[in-house]
Structures are given as structure tokens and as C-alpha cells.
Amino acid sequence: MDFKQKVVDLVSEQVDLPKEKISMLIERPKNPKMGDYAFPAFALAKIEHKNPALIAKDIAEKISDDNFTSIQAVGPYVNFAIDHAKLVNATLNDVLTEKEHFGDQKLGEGNVPIDMSSPNIAKPMSMGHLRSTVIGNSIAKTLEKVGYTPIKINYLGDYGTQFGKLITAYRLWGNEGDVKKDPITNLFHYYVKFHEEAEKDPKLEDEGRAAFKKLENGDEEEIKLWKWFREVSLQEFNRIYKELGVTFDSYNGEAFFNDKMQPVVDELREKGLLEESRGAQVVNLGEDENPALILKSDGSSLYMTRDLAAALYRKKEYDFVMSLYVAGGEQTGHFKQLKQVLKKMGYDWSDNIHHIPFGLITQGGKKLSTRKGNVVFLDQVLKDAVSLAEQQIEEKNPNLSNKKQVAHDVGVGAVVFHDLKNDRMDNFDFDLEEVVRFEGDTGPYVQYTNARAQSILRKANKEISMDNLSLNDDWSFAVAKALADFPAIVEKASEKFEPSIIAKYALDLSKKFNKYYANVRILDEDNQLNARLALVQATSIVLTEALRLLGVNAPKEM
């Protein structure tokens, strides 16, 4: 039962406000002794020209409902105190009946392409790529839970001037045998060396540009090298995606749109939107805005041209209701321009394009940069995380049967959870030892809580009945109330494209359950044993589902 909705329904019978407005106004009192929900009468005071405290008193006197132990006016608020036993009973019934579908909703429908991860070919996946990958993956899972059809697109950086640089670098310093032995490490080494040498000899940049131009013009040798670099890189990326448990519906990268850009340029020209500026072709976006660069002075294409082609292709291919781009905050200007150009072209659906920005991962307070080579490789981080998890499992539970698999789930899950528990826009510092701890605000803490719940259920070894699931103690109520909040948490996370809402919720539910575990003798044989076990089972169901929405596995033993 949705107790907040019950409050909305009761208040709406007494006041002349739409239910949506009432729902937005309802608050949670900071002091639990004041009740569980509060309706403020300030909005009505403006309409009725009456003291809000008198309005609150009037409403409270007219409402009664046996789902609440008290409904009373406190100053300008109407406070509602839920009947604890009824909330516990109703919530446990809902969770145990709906199982992993608890929290499923129909908030929308239709295709939602999500442009995410998108690493550059021939460079190792770094911690920077982790953010776009796991944020996009979690948003996809959450949108699916509320009715949409997500389409995960890995818009590979498999084209662009960097390939001219890489081809030049490979010809100068490369060697086929080394690349075959360890493709990514060596290709990346050539790329870094190119930038180091180009700082001393700027002519190298011209050579790189010339090589890219040959690639664009279909030079056979250049294309052969480019295809090889792409193939060996993709094999490496897919190995890491498998570790993370992330899959994609499309790998159409930048190169896929090579033959789709000219029609965009032609359309811009036909619609009179292209202007010349210092030899380049641009779309003017108004006095206060920088123009959108479409073609360089040498006629070669730019990111904007390609992204316009991609946006038009995705609309035609998927007829999307929303299109999301999970990319760093530094690209905000680019996506703003993309929407503005599409709008000028007459495509009103551009309003449904959303950039989902995120902050930086730092290490020791320093930004990670590929070009300078001071980059933290994601592959190594995941290996180290699994190794740390393995050490802790060895200490805590040396007889665990499937140690390797659990260490993988805990180590990789710890890295993913740590990323997602931070507000999407926040920058955060990454310290692996903190991340993989079994205590504190970590993924392993949530996983361990779920494993603890599973252990209790194994010990009890009882079939849980749906009869009489009422519990009256404060510890049970705190857990059940948190469980009851899960659908609203899912809704909020999906609307704000904010996985941290789910991660913070999972931590909060874990803390409440662990307090319950410390204060209640769960396995005592009495007439409330069944209800207590139902609470344990419901907690495990919701924790497992919350972790799934974050892309984290929930081992049953740890």
C-alpha cells in the first residue's frame, strides 16, 4: 500500500487542489515523533486568505482513517502518523508478492537510445570511461523498470584526427609484432609518444592531419591500418565490458556515419543555415552564442557534423521518445549547440535530447589525462579490486565454496557502486582500499548486508507464510518504512537520471536492517517469527533489486 498516496487522497477530499499539487507539497517531518507525513497549509492560506494554522486545524478535524494512529494539526501543518503494524503488514505483503518486480512502474514507454561509454579506439579504457559506462548502464536498467525500452549505444571513437596521428606514430616507431603481442598498451604508447614529440616538432601535427585526410579519402593502406587498430581494440574493450556485466545494443561508432554527413551538410545548405566564417562553414546560433562549426576550412568534417548525422539516424531508426548522451560535463556546450542546430533545421524532437553530464574522477586530487599518459587503466583497477576483495573474504570466511566468483562480484561491484553512490555531477577522489572495504558507505557493505539476510533465512530453514505479517517494534518499522519507499526512489532516480539516489537508498536500507539485526532476536521461536523472517526476506529482495539497478551483483554468501 502507498501510504503517501493515501495521505494525498484524504487531503484532496478536503481541499480544492489537484492531487499532483498535494503530492508535491507533502513533506516528511524531520522529527519522527511529529508523524510520518505532513501537509503544509501555506498554499491554501494564499487562496483562502486565512491563517494557515486555522486551515490545518480545520482539515485535521475532518479527516479520520484507520491506517493512521493520529491525524492532527501542529501549527500550519497537518501531521499523519502511520499505524506501524499496518505499514509493516502491507509492505511485506507487497514485496513478497511482487518479488523483484516490486517498484516496477509505468511512468512512460517508447525507445530511449542511450549514448554511453564510447571509448576511443587504440587507447586503453580508463577510469574516466568507467563513469559514462556505469552511469549509462544504471540509467538504462532504471528506465526499463519504469516502462521505457532503453537502447544502449556504444558510439565508439573509431574515427577522427587522432587516427592520422596514430598512423603516423605507428609508421615512425611501431612494429607489427609488438602490436599483436599487446595491442592496446603499444598503440597507446605510440599515441603518447606522438604528443611528446609533437611538442618539440610541430610538423608532426601536419603529418598526422595529412594521414587522416588520406584515410578520409579512402586510401587503401590507411584504411587497412585503421581497421586493424579498431578490431584489436574492440576485443580488449569487450573483455572489460564482460567483467563489468555491461552489454550494448549497438556499436555504431563515428566511422558508421562517414557516409551520412554529406546529406546533413546539403540539408543545412538548402535550408540557408550554413555561413562562411574564416574559411570554415558554420551555423550561426545568435549574437550571444558561439557558432556551430560544421566543416573546417580544408573541407574536413567536425564532431558536430557527425553528431547531427547520428541524431537524425537515431530518430529515423528508433523513433525515440527521448535520446540521452551520457558524457562529461565539459561537453555541455557541444550538446546545447547540437540541440540548437537541430531546432533551426526544424526538428522539434530535439527538445527530447538530453545531455547527462557527470563530474571527474581524480586520484590524489589530480585530474586523469590520456594525452599526458598519467592515466589509470580500468582493467588494472578491476583486477586490483578483485584481489583486495579476495584477501578480505579469505580473512572473514576462508571456507566459502565459490570464493573466486564472490571476490569478482564484490571487487568489481565495489568499483561500480563507489562511482554511482556519488552524485552524478560531483567530482570525487578514488582510493581503491577505501572502495573495497566491507564497512562504511561501500558496495561490499550493502552486499554483505544482503548475504547476512540470506544466511538468516538459511539458518531458519522455514517456509514463510503470508498470514499475519504485523510487527510493532521500532526497528522493524524503520526497515519496513524504508522498503515501502523503494518505488518512489526508483521513480525519482529515473526522472532525474541519477543512480546515486538508488545507491544512497541501498546504504540507508542496509544500515536500518543492521540495526534491526543488532537489536532484535530474529530467530526466537514465537508467534512473530514468521513476520520477522518475512522482513528479512523482503529486505534481501529489495537490496538485490537495488544493486541490480546499479549493475552490481548480490552474492548470497560472502
Swiss-Prot record:
Signal peptide: none annotated. GO terms for biological process: arginyl-tRNA aminoacylation. InterPro entries: Arg-tRNA-ligase (IPR001278), Arg-tRNA-synth_N (IPR005148), Arg-tRNA-synth_N_sf (IPR036695), ArgRS_core (IPR035684), DALR_anticod-bd (IPR008909), Rossmann-like_a/b/a_fold (IPR014729), tRNAsynth_Ia_anticodon-bd (IPR009080). The keyword Metal-binding does not apply. It is found in: Cytoplasm. Its main location: cytoplasm. One of its GO terms (molecular function) is arginine-tRNA ligase activity. Keywords: Aminoacyl-tRNA synthetase, ATP-binding, Cytoplasm, Ligase, Nucleotide-binding, Protein biosynthesis. It comes from the Bacteria. It is an enzyme of class 6 (ligase). Monomer. PANTHER family: ARGININE--TRNA LIGASE, CYTOPLASMIC (PTHR11956:SF5), ARGINYL-TRNA SYNTHETASE (PTHR11956). NCBIfam families: argS. This is Arginine--tRNA ligase. The gene is argS.
